[in-house]
Design a protein with these regions (language model features):
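Extracellular glycan-binding segments that recognize GlcNAc-based cell-wall polysaccharides
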Residues: 27-170
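Solvent-exposed hydroxyl-ligand-binding patches built from regularly spaced Ser/Thr
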Residues: 171-292, 296, 300-309
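Bacterial N-terminal signal peptides
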Residues: 11-21
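Feature targets compositionally biased, intrinsically disordered low-complexity regions
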Residues: 1, 41, 59-64, 78, ...
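Bacterial N-terminal signal peptides that target proteins for export
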Residues: 1-12
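N-terminal signal peptide c-region/cleavage motif recognized by signal peptidases
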Residues: 23-25
Length: 309
């Protein structure tokens, strides 16, 4: 009983520290959204205010760093995300639904105004509800696999509540990629083994490959012909202005693979997390032997597997 009371007091104390006014000026320009975790009641909170973030960390919250960036242009803005506080449980709730925001306010939740803006496209934030908990009953995640797993465990899935704009990141390792016959090459029609420098970056949910120097990206069909600027076969990519762009989603990974030389072409396609795990296990079993030159990129832009023949 004493331990329970002590934890409740700590929980309440941490929650009270978070009762500060949200600075509306912070919405004027793009800023990172910071995530915090209250280990005493399981509450997660997001804030645009770095000073608030630092203050809560000093008060005992666990700072979990940058979650995403709030959009700064009106054209990228889907709407506002509102923040509420439950004085009885210490929980913070985030919603774009003003009706829900207003209804909970009338039910006794503290309405804390606009927390940040939701992006039109980006990383969806999924909301879950645990009916058995008395504090920290809601959880938000940008990982669809985690969302699905928790629903199977009994959490109530409440769908996407807002979207975050992922900051631009550079792909690790993908700065020089060896390629071969009938594949994606850099401005040269020689049919022997070629090499090209390709840089890659992710902004929002788009992966862009850009050739270095004055080279252009060409897509070669199995017979050595150029596919020009048409959408690439067997892919979700499009050529535009010498760059190659692909849409990424949070629940999938990207595969760039090169098949046998006799009938090969570069294939960019999406795979699910289960398939990604199978490929990782297969890599561990066979080492570096295999039929593909392959790069696997997760939705956050990290190269999780790199195999070159």
């Amino acid at each position: 009983m004493r331990e329970h009371a002590r934890r409740w007091v700590l929980c309440a104390a941490l929650a009270l520290v978070a009762l500060v006014a949200l600075p509306q000026a912070a919405l004027a320009e793009a800023k990172p959204v910071w995530r915090l975790y209250n280990r005493y009641d399981g509450d997660h909170m997001w804030t645009l205010d770095k000073a608030e973030y630092d203050s809560l960390v000093k008060a005992g919250w666990t700072g979990e760093g940058k979650a995403w960036e709030a959009p700064h242009k009106e054209s990228m803005n889907e709407g506002f995300v509102y923040r509420l506080y439950n004085p009885w449980s210490g929980e913070h709730l985030f919603t774009m639904d003003y009706g829900e925001y207003d209804q909970l306010g009338k039910a006794g939740w503290r309405k804390e105004g606009t927390a940040f803006e939701s992006a039109k496209v980006g990383a969806p934030a999924w909301r879950l509800y645990n009916r058995w908990l008395t504090a920290g009953t809601h959880l938000y995640t940008t990982d669809k696999a985690e969302y699905d797993r928790l629903v199977k465990l009994g959490w109530v899935g409440e769908g996407v509540r807002f979207c975050g704009k992922l900051p631009e990141s550079r792909l690790k390792q993908l700065t020089y990629y060896r390629i071969g016959l009938n594949s994606l090459i850099g401005g040269d029609d020689h049919l022997d083994m070629l090499s090209t420098g390709v840089s890659a970056s992710i902004r929002g949910d788009t992966l862009t490959l850009t050739p270095k120097g004055d080279r252009a990206l060409l897509v070669k069909d199995p017979f050595g012909g150029s596919a020009g600027d048409e959408t690439i076969i067997n892919s979700a990519g499009e050529l535009s202005g010498g760059k190659l762009s692909f849409r990424l989603t949070e629940s999938t990974a990207y595969v760039v693979e090169y098949d046998a030389p006799t009938d090969a072409m570069f294939i960019f396609r999406m795979i699910g997390r289960e398939e990604l795990e199978k490929r990782r296990q297969w890599r561990g079993n066979v080492g570096t032997l295999g039929r593909y030159d392959e790069v696997i990129v997760d939705a956050r832009g990290n190269v999780v597997s790199l195999l070159l023949r």
